Each structure stands twice: as C-alpha cells, then as structure tokens.
A protein has these predicted regions:
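All-alpha prenyltransferase/terpene-synthase fold signal
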Residues: 1-277
Length: 277
C-alpha cells in the first residue's frame, strides 16, 4: 500500500504543475500560498480511497485543493485580508483584478481534474462550487446566527461532501454509507472550530489574521456561544463531535476519524484556555 506522504507529494506536484501554467508573476505569488496549508480535505480523500485507484484519488485530491485555493483567493478579497498561510494574499501582491481572474481559472482547472476522475466526480465538485457561491451570497447579504449552519453547509461542508464523493469514485463506490454523514458532520465541526479560532486564535500559528469575522460584521455561532459562556462552547463541541466518532465506529476508519476529531477539539481547547485565563 502506498503511504500517505507519497500520495500527498503527488498531489502537491499536480498543484505545482497547475500553478506554473499561470507564468510569472502570478505563479510566484500563488505558489507561496498553494505550497503550504494543512491539506485537510486532500488527506481525508486519500485516506478514504486507500483501497481504490491511487491515480484517481490523487487527481481528486488535487481538484479539491485547487477549488479550495480559489475560494481562499476570493475570501481574502472580500475580507480585505493581507495574509494567507504566512504569505501576502494574491490581491495584495498583484491587485484585485488579477486575483479575481486567477481564482476563476483555478475553479476551471479543479473541474477539469475532477472530471478526469469520473464524470460523476466532476459533477460533485461542480455542485460544491455552486453551494459555496450560494452560501457566500447568503453571508454577504447579512445572514444572522440563525442561518449559521446554512452558510457552513454551503461554504465548508460542500467541499467535504465533494471529497467524499471523489474518494468513493476512486474506490469504485465501495465506501460505507455512514461515513458520508460522518464526513459532513466533521465539516461542521471543522468550521465551528475555525470560526472559534478567528475569535481567540493567534495569527502566527494560523498564518492569517484573526478577528476578521467581527471586522466584517459576520454573525458566527461560536461568537454567540462565547457570549453565554466558555462552557456553552464546550457543550456545542461535544454535540458536534460525538456523532462523528459514533458514525465511523463500525468502519475501518474509526481510529482515523477519532484522531482527526480530537485534533480539532484540542485546537478549540487551546482557544478556550486563552479566553478564560
């Protein structure tokens, strides 16, 4: 069996090939952002497809990362963020017009790669892109905390859904059904913790500015929970994390899901520890 590090290196090579097609100066500025990052979605996809076709899985993982990269470029423009993954954001480095068109091109490249997995894989990623756009429109129109999960399901869970779909296509449709729900719930926990880190995280550790949700008058659930108490956040984290572990418990990925869920809880715990000092 090919190890994850080798497959991730293959994913990175595909990303660099796409980045290089932009030429200078875009390739240099974009490469500084594309060459790092946690690769959460790619890692999950590769893990779920470990018994499948590795070539297809690498294509799918690269497609997901390219689409995610495009959304980050757009997000940074909307948020007015100067920093992403410890590097200047693309619109800061080269201006808004270049950043906008580069993100659009990344979406096209992502869809081409996903379609090369299977046509169904291409459709899954296209659906994720539409859901992302719809949720960002909802957020830009001033979604309240009551619509928080609608926004999250669109802008974050959609890409985890696509990761599962591309993994399943790479594995010949053999993934257990409960894992799909586990992945979706993980996506919700992932975004909740990310929003919590925006409130109380550290820029040096995250590689991006914090406090952007408040600066942009976005209404997030972690902010509302923190107004109640840190214990309210802890209770929410338990509600979000418990089903993930239970749904995956009967599969061979039980330990993997338990581990990645615990890492998110640990990250949230560090924020809460600082908030209550």
């Amino acid at each position: 069996m090919v190890d994850e590090a080798s497959l991730l290196a293959d994913v990175d090579r595909q990303l660099h090939v796409v980045v290089a097609t932009f030429g200078e100066p875009v390739a240099d500025a974009l490469g500084a952002i594309a060459g790092s990052g946690s690769r959460h979605r790619a890692r999950l996809l590769l893990e779920l497809a470990r018994h499948g076709d590795h070539t297809l899985a690498v294509r799918g993982a690269a497609a997901v990362e390219l689409l995610h990269l495009g959304t980050l470029v757009h997000d940074d423009i909307v948020d007015g963020s100067p920093l992403r993954r410890h590097a200047p954001t693309l619109h800061v480095a080269l201006g808004v017009p270049v950043a906008l068109w580069t993100a659009d091109a990344l979406y096209a490249e992502a869809l081409h790669l996903a379609d090369a997995v299977t046509p169904a894989g291409g459709l899954a990623l296209g659906d994720a892109l539409r859901r992302i756009a719809d949720s960002q429109i909802l957020e830009a129109l001033g979604a309240t905390t009551a619509r928080y999960w609608d926004v999250v399901d669109g802008k974050t869970v959609s890409l985890f859904d696509a990761s599962f779909a591309l993994a399943d296509e790479s594995a010949g449709g053999a993934l257990p059904a409960p894992l799909r729900d586990a992945v979706r719930r993980y996506g919700r926990l992932f975004q909740y913790v990310d929003d919590l880190q925006d409130i109380g995280g550290e820029t040096d550790a995250l590689g991006k500015p914090t406090g952007q949700d408040a600066d942009n008058q976005l209404h997030t659930l972690p902010a509302a929970d923190l107004v109640v108490s840190a214990d309210a956040v802890r209770e929410r984290l338990r509600e979000l994390s418990g089903p993930i572990v239970r749904l995956a418990s009967s599969t061979e990925w039980a330990d993997h899901f338990a581990g990645m869920t615990q890492r998110l809880l640990d990250a949230a715990g560090r924020v809460l520890d600082r908030a209550t000092v």
